[in-house]
Design a protein with these regions (language model features):
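Thr-biased low-complexity repeat/linker tracts and other Thr-enriched repetitive architectures
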Residues: 92-95, 143-148, 170-176, 194-199, ...
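Blade-level signature of beta-propeller repeat domains, shared across WD40, Kelch, NHL, RCC1
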Residues: 358-409
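Conserved core positions of repeat-based scaffolds
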Residues: 28, 34-37, 46, 85-88, ...
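An edge-strand/N-cap motif at the start of beta-rich repeat modules
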Residues: 19-52, 67, 72, 375
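Short glycine/serine- and acidic-residue-enriched loop/turn motifs that recur at repeat junctions
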Residues: 47-66, 98-118, 152-169, 202-220, ...
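C-terminal outer-membrane/trafficking sorting elements
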Residues: 415-488
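Short loop/turn segments immediately following the C-termini of beta-strands
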Residues: 33, 40, 49-51, 84, ...
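Sec-dependent, cleavable N-terminal signal peptides
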Residues: 1-22
Length: 488
């Protein structure tokens, strides 16, 4: 036994300390209160709330501020966080869903929640997916052939099928066009751009968010204006942000709290815009927009590189990142929260450039061009990934951006750090198990037995171990298992 353990330890030691570049983040998406991130080795990591299993890590009971890897696959390409659900695309073009399946939002057709990623159908040509995110249970996706597909709730015609109120539990093609380029969803409306540069919209239009000059809702895609130079569009809540090829920003819909970014004072504020209106106060080219129902973040720069970030709106739980936020408690009111009707800048370090900006419910995440992650705002579910203890999370906020380290744990698929079904997981200090495991032992890499238990149910802390790499051996369902763990 000891000899085999020593041999395995030697092999693991070699693989662990193989020369490799420092791990860094390449993509990230803020859901309602759950964060999905991809590391440069293609592994998927999550943190935040897990009430519907949306982390893809069943061992997390409710929430966590520690990034955990979802399985050991190293071919994740794209992530999209929603309202207690997430969508994921792999390099092979397969689409996966995790979390709640309310209204058929996962597109899996089985009507059940999934606590680990579940493949959506068998197609291998998915290119992009978006969702209603914080407000409901609808998703739309574009395939590599340019066709548009949707599923989930269609309560406000946000799917664009024309079948008002008819939910779809599996992907259904929207029309027959095959030249869709990008698509984005608000609370109940959808905006999209075709490869010919035309802008389209459908669904709810009660705030003028479609930008067609009316407040009349539509059931299927309609072209917005006649321009053919649109390059980017973002739908957020009841408002829309569209960018032309020259980087100019046009906005429409609800302008509560100045969320359209027009830099109007509270006294000057116009509540709604029914047509796309130029945001002439932006002197830099706008690259992307993100936000929630009461906050908007704008990314500006050149050639896809973000050089500056602006925020506007409500500053609950530090959402604006300017240092002036306030904690929302059970006894306080949203009316007491500070807000800015004009653009402010989060207190990010000077001189940095960014590749990704994503905002969730009162929190934001920005990845620098060299893969570092800065985060600010609400952290009550651990969605910022800062390793805050669970007991401290109910009051955890960051009024200004903080650097969130990327986990450096080596993920080796040949010796699982997590069983494929997520039965057993180690978060750096505690072993979690969804089923009882027996004959549990922890060995040093030299083969010395350091800790032992006959049976472990749910949790087993190893705080007495020094920081380092160890071997965990245990029996599950009569079968022996070995996994590498890293004590933080």
């Amino acid at each position: 036994m000891k000899k085999s353990t020593l041999l395995m330890a030697a092999a693991l030691l070699a693989s662990t300390f193989n020369a490799h570049s420092e791990y860094y983040w390449t993509n990230i998406s803020a859901g309602d209160a759950t964060t999905y991130a991809i590391r440069n080795d293609g592994t998927l990591w999550t943190c935040g709330w897990n009430e519907k299993g949306q982390l893809g890590v069943p061992s997390v009971k409710e929430r966590t501020a520690t990034f955990s890897t979802v399985g050991t696959d190293k071919n994740w390409k794209f992530v999209e966080g929603g309202k207690a659900y997430g969508f994921l695309i792999k390099e092979d073009g397969t689409l996966w869903a995790v979390g709640t399946n309310t209204d058929g939002v996962q597109g899996t057709g089985d009507g059940i929640d999934h606590k680990t990623p579940k493949q959506v159908g068998t197609d291998t040509d998915w290119a992009y997916v978006t969702s209603v995110r914080f407000w409901g249970y609808t998703a739309l996706a574009i395939k590599t052939d340019g066709t548009l597909w949707g599923w989930g709730s269609n309560s406000s015609n946000q799917l664009g099928t024309g079948n008002t109120g008819k939910n779809e539990t599996t992907p259904i093609q929207i029309g027959t066009d095959n030249n869709w380029k990008t698509v984005s969803m608000g609370v109940a409306h959808t905006m999209a751009i075709k490869t010919d540069g035309t802008l389209w919209g459908w669904g709810n239009n009660s705030s003028g968010q479609l930008g067609n000059g009316t407040q009349t809702s539509v059931t299927t895609p309609v072209q917005i204006g006649t321009d053919t130079d649109w390059s980017y569009v973002k739908a957020i809540d009841n408002r829309t942000y569209a960018v032309k090829t020259d980087g100019t920003l046009y906005v429409c819909g609800s302008n509560a709290y100045g969320l359209l970014g027009l830099n109007q004072s509270e006294e000057e504020l116009i509540s709604n815009y029914n047509t796309l209106t130029l945001a002439s106060n932006f002197t830099e080219k706008v690259i992307s927009v993100s936000g929630c129902e009461n906050t908007t973040t704008f990314a500006v720069g050149e050639n896809g590189i973000i050089s500056k970030i602006y925020t506007v709106g409500d500053n609950t739980d530090g959402a604006l990142g300017d240092g002036n936020g306030k904690l929302l408690t059970a006894t306080s009111s949203s009316d007491e929260m500070p807000r800015s009707y004009t653009l402010v800048e989060p207190l990010l370090p000077e001189g940095l450039n960014y590749s990704v900006l994503s905002s969730g419910q009162n929190y934001s995440l920005a990845i620098t061009t060299d893969g570092k992650l800065y985060a600010w705002g609400r952290n009550k579910g651990g969605q910022l990934g800062d390793d805050t203890d669970v007991d401290m999370l109910p009051t955890s906020i960051y009024k200004k951006p903080v650097l969130i380290p990327c986990p450096q744990t080596e993920i080796d698929a040949s010796v699982n750090t997590v069983l494929s079904d997520n039965t057993v997981r180690f978060n750096g200090s505690t072993l979690y198990t969804t089923e009882p495991i027996q004959n549990v032992s922890i060995y040093s890499l030299s083969g010395a037995l350091l800790k032992k238990a006959n049976t472990v149910e749910q949790t087993w802390t190893v705080d007495n171990l020094e920081k380092g790499i160890y071997l965990l051996q245990y029996t599950l369902d009569g079968k022996p298992n070995t996994m590498k763990i890293v004590k933080k």
